[in-house]
Amino acid sequence: MLQRSVFFLSDRTGITAETLGHSLLTQFDGIEWKKHYASFLDSAAKAQAVIEQINTIAEQEGQPALVFSTLLDPVMLASIRRADCVLFDFFETCLGTLEAVLQQPPARIPGRSHVLRQDASYFRRIAAIQYALNSDDGANAKILADADVIVVGVSRTGKTPVCVYLALQYGVLAANYPFTPEDMGAIQLPPLLQPLRKKLFGLTLNTSRLQSIREERYPGSHYASFAECQRELQWQNELYRQFDIPSINTTDVSIEEISASIVNRAHLERRQHGT
Protein backbone atom coordinates (compact mmCIF):
# COMPACT_ATOMS: atom_id res chain seq x y z
CA MET A 1 0.00 0.00 0.00
CA LEU A 2 1.22 3.49 -0.84
CA GLN A 3 2.40 5.50 2.17
CA ARG A 4 2.51 9.29 2.52
CA SER A 5 3.52 11.43 5.46
CA VAL A 6 1.19 14.24 6.41
CA PHE A 7 1.62 17.02 8.96
CA PHE A 8 -1.06 19.04 10.75
CA LEU A 9 0.30 22.39 11.94
CA SER A 10 -1.35 25.01 14.11
CA ASP A 11 -0.54 27.89 16.42
CA ARG A 12 -3.34 26.68 18.70
CA THR A 13 -4.97 23.29 19.32
CA GLY A 14 -4.70 21.92 15.79
CA ILE A 15 -8.29 20.70 15.79
CA THR A 16 -9.27 22.76 12.74
CA ALA A 17 -6.26 21.70 10.67
CA GLU A 18 -6.77 18.05 11.58
CA THR A 19 -10.52 18.07 10.92
CA LEU A 20 -10.30 19.79 7.55
CA GLY A 21 -7.24 17.84 6.48
CA HIS A 22 -8.77 14.52 7.45
CA SER A 23 -11.92 15.38 5.48
CA LEU A 24 -9.80 15.79 2.37
CA LEU A 25 -7.62 12.72 2.92
CA THR A 26 -10.60 10.40 3.30
CA GLN A 27 -11.44 11.03 -0.35
CA PHE A 28 -8.37 9.03 -1.41
CA ASP A 29 -8.38 5.24 -1.09
CA GLY A 30 -5.44 2.87 -0.97
CA ILE A 31 -3.06 5.19 0.90
CA GLU A 32 -1.69 4.67 4.40
CA TRP A 33 -1.30 8.08 6.00
CA LYS A 34 1.59 8.53 8.45
CA LYS A 35 0.30 11.42 10.52
CA HIS A 36 2.35 13.96 12.48
CA TYR A 37 0.87 16.67 14.68
CA ALA A 38 2.41 19.96 15.79
CA SER A 39 0.19 22.31 17.78
CA PHE A 40 0.90 25.56 19.64
CA LEU A 41 3.64 26.57 17.21
CA ASP A 42 4.18 30.01 18.70
CA SER A 43 7.91 30.57 18.26
CA ALA A 44 10.55 30.48 15.55
CA ALA A 45 12.39 27.72 17.42
CA LYS A 46 9.35 25.44 17.45
CA ALA A 47 8.71 26.11 13.77
CA GLN A 48 12.33 25.33 12.90
CA ALA A 49 12.14 22.00 14.74
CA VAL A 50 9.07 21.04 12.69
CA ILE A 51 10.73 22.16 9.45
CA GLU A 52 13.71 19.92 10.19
CA GLN A 53 11.37 17.00 10.86
CA ILE A 54 9.51 17.64 7.59
CA ASN A 55 12.76 17.79 5.62
CA THR A 56 14.14 14.64 7.25
CA ILE A 57 11.01 12.61 6.51
CA ALA A 58 10.78 13.94 2.96
CA GLU A 59 14.39 12.91 2.34
CA GLN A 60 13.82 9.45 3.81
CA GLU A 61 10.69 8.86 1.74
CA GLY A 62 11.98 10.47 -1.43
CA GLN A 63 8.92 12.68 -1.82
CA PRO A 64 7.59 15.91 -0.30
CA ALA A 65 5.50 15.68 2.85
CA LEU A 66 1.94 16.97 2.82
CA VAL A 67 1.30 19.80 5.28
CA PHE A 68 -2.11 21.07 6.39
CA SER A 69 -1.81 24.36 8.23
CA THR A 70 -3.92 26.89 10.10
CA LEU A 71 -0.91 29.02 11.07
CA LEU A 72 -1.52 32.77 10.99
CA ASP A 73 1.99 34.17 11.40
CA PRO A 74 3.16 35.14 7.87
CA VAL A 75 6.85 34.83 8.79
CA MET A 76 6.35 31.32 10.15
CA LEU A 77 4.31 30.38 7.08
CA ALA A 78 7.05 31.63 4.79
CA SER A 79 9.52 29.37 6.60
CA ILE A 80 7.23 26.35 6.26
CA ARG A 81 6.81 27.02 2.54
CA ARG A 82 10.57 26.68 2.06
CA ALA A 83 10.53 23.18 3.57
CA ASP A 84 10.37 20.06 1.38
CA CYS A 85 6.58 19.87 1.46
CA VAL A 86 3.34 20.61 -0.31
CA LEU A 87 1.56 23.16 1.87
CA PHE A 88 -2.22 23.41 2.16
CA ASP A 89 -2.84 26.68 3.98
CA PHE A 90 -6.49 26.73 5.02
CA PHE A 91 -6.60 30.27 6.40
CA GLU A 92 -4.67 32.02 3.63
CA THR A 93 -6.83 30.28 1.03
CA CYS A 94 -9.90 32.05 2.41
CA LEU A 95 -8.66 35.14 4.25
CA GLY A 96 -7.52 36.95 1.12
CA THR A 97 -10.91 36.60 -0.53
CA LEU A 98 -12.74 37.59 2.65
CA GLU A 99 -10.50 40.62 3.07
CA ALA A 100 -11.34 41.77 -0.45
CA VAL A 101 -15.08 41.21 -0.03
CA LEU A 102 -15.33 42.77 3.44
CA GLN A 103 -12.77 45.49 2.67
CA GLN A 104 -11.22 44.93 6.07
CA PRO A 105 -7.92 43.27 7.01
CA PRO A 106 -8.13 40.16 9.23
CA ALA A 107 -7.00 40.44 12.85
CA ARG A 108 -4.73 37.37 12.54
CA ILE A 109 -5.17 36.51 16.21
CA PRO A 110 -4.59 32.79 16.92
CA GLY A 111 -7.25 30.86 18.81
CA ARG A 112 -10.19 33.18 18.24
CA SER A 113 -12.46 30.32 17.20
CA HIS A 114 -11.84 28.67 20.59
CA VAL A 115 -12.56 31.72 22.74
CA LEU A 116 -15.41 31.02 25.15
CA ARG A 117 -18.13 33.55 24.61
CA GLN A 118 -20.51 33.49 27.51
CA ASP A 119 -23.67 34.18 25.54
CA ALA A 120 -26.95 32.25 25.46
CA SER A 121 -25.48 29.67 23.06
CA TYR A 122 -22.53 28.98 25.38
CA PHE A 123 -24.70 28.45 28.44
CA ARG A 124 -27.10 26.26 26.49
CA ARG A 125 -24.23 23.98 25.50
CA ILE A 126 -23.09 23.65 29.10
CA ALA A 127 -26.62 22.81 30.23
CA ALA A 128 -27.05 20.37 27.33
CA ILE A 129 -23.85 18.49 28.20
CA GLN A 130 -24.97 18.14 31.81
CA TYR A 131 -28.37 16.94 30.63
CA ALA A 132 -26.82 14.33 28.32
CA LEU A 133 -24.75 12.94 31.19
CA ASN A 134 -27.65 12.94 33.65
CA SER A 135 -29.99 11.16 31.24
CA ASP A 136 -27.51 8.63 29.84
CA ASP A 137 -28.97 5.15 29.30
CA GLY A 138 -32.39 6.31 30.49
CA ALA A 139 -30.92 6.80 33.95
CA ASN A 140 -33.27 9.59 34.98
CA ALA A 141 -36.80 9.01 33.76
CA LYS A 142 -38.02 12.20 35.44
CA ILE A 143 -36.11 14.44 33.03
CA LEU A 144 -36.69 12.41 29.85
CA ALA A 145 -39.64 14.57 28.82
CA ASP A 146 -37.35 17.63 28.78
CA ALA A 147 -35.37 16.24 25.85
CA ASP A 148 -35.31 17.84 22.42
CA VAL A 149 -34.59 14.37 21.04
CA ILE A 150 -34.35 10.89 22.57
CA VAL A 151 -31.81 8.67 20.83
CA VAL A 152 -32.82 5.00 21.05
CA GLY A 153 -31.24 1.70 20.07
CA VAL A 154 -29.99 -1.61 21.39
CA SER A 155 -26.83 -1.77 23.47
CA ARG A 156 -23.60 -0.62 21.77
CA THR A 157 -25.12 1.27 18.84
CA GLY A 158 -23.33 4.49 19.82
CA LYS A 159 -26.09 6.40 21.59
CA THR A 160 -24.00 8.05 24.32
CA PRO A 161 -21.29 9.64 22.14
CA VAL A 162 -23.93 10.91 19.73
CA CYS A 163 -25.86 12.57 22.56
CA VAL A 164 -22.75 14.18 24.01
CA TYR A 165 -21.74 15.46 20.57
CA LEU A 166 -25.24 16.87 19.97
CA ALA A 167 -24.98 18.70 23.27
CA LEU A 168 -21.45 19.99 22.72
CA GLN A 169 -21.79 21.03 19.10
CA TYR A 170 -25.45 22.03 18.82
CA GLY A 171 -26.67 22.70 22.35
CA VAL A 172 -29.38 20.07 21.87
CA LEU A 173 -30.92 18.39 24.93
CA ALA A 174 -30.31 14.80 23.84
CA ALA A 175 -31.29 11.88 26.05
CA ASN A 176 -30.75 8.24 25.18
CA TYR A 177 -32.68 5.10 25.99
CA PRO A 178 -31.29 1.57 25.49
CA PHE A 179 -33.56 -1.23 24.34
CA THR A 180 -32.89 -4.26 26.54
CA PRO A 181 -33.87 -7.93 26.11
CA GLU A 182 -36.68 -7.28 28.62
CA ASP A 183 -38.24 -4.86 26.12
CA MET A 184 -38.16 -7.36 23.27
CA GLY A 185 -41.38 -9.28 23.54
CA ALA A 186 -44.13 -7.88 21.40
CA ILE A 187 -43.26 -5.13 18.94
CA GLN A 188 -44.27 -2.21 21.10
CA LEU A 189 -42.66 0.81 22.69
CA PRO A 190 -41.58 0.56 26.32
CA PRO A 191 -44.21 2.34 28.48
CA LEU A 192 -41.80 5.14 29.38
CA LEU A 193 -41.37 6.08 25.71
CA GLN A 194 -44.97 5.83 24.57
CA PRO A 195 -45.94 9.46 25.37
CA LEU A 196 -42.60 10.66 23.93
CA ARG A 197 -42.84 8.88 20.59
CA LYS A 198 -42.47 12.06 18.51
CA LYS A 199 -39.08 12.76 20.11
CA LEU A 200 -37.52 9.39 19.26
CA PHE A 201 -34.66 8.91 16.80
CA GLY A 202 -33.23 5.45 16.25
CA LEU A 203 -29.69 4.21 15.68
CA THR A 204 -28.97 0.87 14.06
CA LEU A 205 -25.95 -1.09 12.84
CA ASN A 206 -25.15 -3.99 10.58
CA THR A 207 -25.20 -7.23 12.56
CA SER A 208 -21.55 -8.07 11.96
CA ARG A 209 -20.45 -4.63 13.12
CA LEU A 210 -22.53 -4.80 16.31
CA GLN A 211 -21.16 -8.26 17.06
CA SER A 212 -17.60 -6.99 16.60
CA ILE A 213 -18.17 -4.10 19.02
CA ARG A 214 -19.75 -6.32 21.66
CA GLU A 215 -17.12 -9.03 21.24
CA GLU A 216 -14.41 -6.52 22.13
CA ARG A 217 -16.13 -5.78 25.42
CA TYR A 218 -17.53 -9.21 26.35
CA PRO A 219 -15.68 -11.84 24.27
CA GLY A 220 -17.37 -15.20 23.89
CA SER A 221 -20.59 -14.11 25.62
CA HIS A 222 -24.18 -14.76 24.53
CA TYR A 223 -24.59 -10.98 24.48
CA ALA A 224 -21.90 -10.75 21.78
CA SER A 225 -23.05 -13.71 19.68
CA PHE A 226 -24.10 -13.13 16.09
CA ALA A 227 -27.50 -14.72 16.73
CA GLU A 228 -28.26 -12.44 19.69
CA CYS A 229 -27.14 -9.32 17.85
CA GLN A 230 -29.25 -10.30 14.87
CA ARG A 231 -32.30 -11.01 17.05
CA GLU A 232 -32.08 -7.67 18.85
CA LEU A 233 -31.53 -5.69 15.65
CA GLN A 234 -34.44 -7.39 13.90
CA TRP A 235 -36.77 -6.52 16.80
CA GLN A 236 -35.47 -2.96 16.97
CA ASN A 237 -35.69 -2.29 13.22
CA GLU A 238 -39.22 -3.66 13.06
CA LEU A 239 -40.13 -1.35 15.95
CA TYR A 240 -38.73 1.60 14.01
CA ARG A 241 -40.79 0.58 10.98
CA GLN A 242 -44.08 -0.01 12.77
CA PHE A 243 -43.93 3.17 14.83
CA ASP A 244 -42.47 5.30 12.04
CA ILE A 245 -39.39 6.21 14.09
CA PRO A 246 -36.73 7.97 11.98
CA SER A 247 -33.43 6.12 12.09
CA ILE A 248 -29.94 5.96 10.65
CA ASN A 249 -27.59 3.05 10.03
CA THR A 250 -24.34 4.16 11.66
CA THR A 251 -22.11 1.31 10.43
CA ASP A 252 -19.93 3.44 8.16
CA VAL A 253 -20.98 6.91 9.30
CA SER A 254 -18.99 9.34 11.45
CA ILE A 255 -20.40 10.79 14.66
CA GLU A 256 -20.42 14.21 13.00
CA GLU A 257 -22.59 12.94 10.15
CA ILE A 258 -24.90 11.04 12.50
CA SER A 259 -25.43 14.14 14.63
CA ALA A 260 -25.96 16.42 11.64
CA SER A 261 -28.52 13.98 10.25
CA ILE A 262 -30.43 13.95 13.55
CA VAL A 263 -30.40 17.75 13.78
CA ASN A 264 -31.66 18.03 10.21
CA ARG A 265 -34.28 15.30 10.22
CA ALA A 266 -35.60 16.16 13.69
CA HIS A 267 -35.76 19.85 12.71
CA LEU A 268 -33.48 20.99 15.52
CA GLU A 269 -31.32 23.46 13.54
CA ARG A 270 -32.46 26.60 15.33
CA ARG A 271 -31.64 25.20 18.76
CA GLN A 272 -27.90 25.16 18.09
CA HIS A 273 -27.92 28.93 18.55
CA GLY A 274 -29.68 28.77 21.87
CA THR A 275 -33.17 29.61 20.54
UniProtKB/Swiss-Prot annotation:
Its EC number is 2.7.11.33, 2.7.4.28. The keyword Chaperone does not apply. ADP binds at G153, V154, S155, R156, T157, G158, K159, T160. The keyword Thylakoid does not apply. It comes from the Bacteria. Keywords: Kinase, Nucleotide-binding, Serine/threonine-protein kinase, Transferase. It holds the Pfam family Kinase-PPPase. It catalyses: [pyruvate, water dikinase] + ADP = [pyruvate, water dikinase]-phosphate + AMP + H(+); [pyruvate, water dikinase]-phosphate + phosphate + H(+) = [pyruvate, water dikinase] + diphosphate. GO terms for molecular function: ADP binding; ATP binding; phosphotransferase activity, phosphate group as acceptor; protein serine/threonine kinase activity. PANTHER family: PYRUVATE, PHOSPHATE DIKINASE REGULATORY PROTEIN 1, CHLOROPLASTIC. Bifunctional serine/threonine kinase and phosphorylase involved in the regulation of the phosphoenolpyruvate synthase (PEPS) by catalyzing its phosphorylation/dephosphorylation. Belongs to the pyruvate, phosphate/water dikinase regulatory protein family. PSRP subfamily. NCBIfam families: PRK05339.1. This is Putative phosphoenolpyruvate synthase regulatory protein.
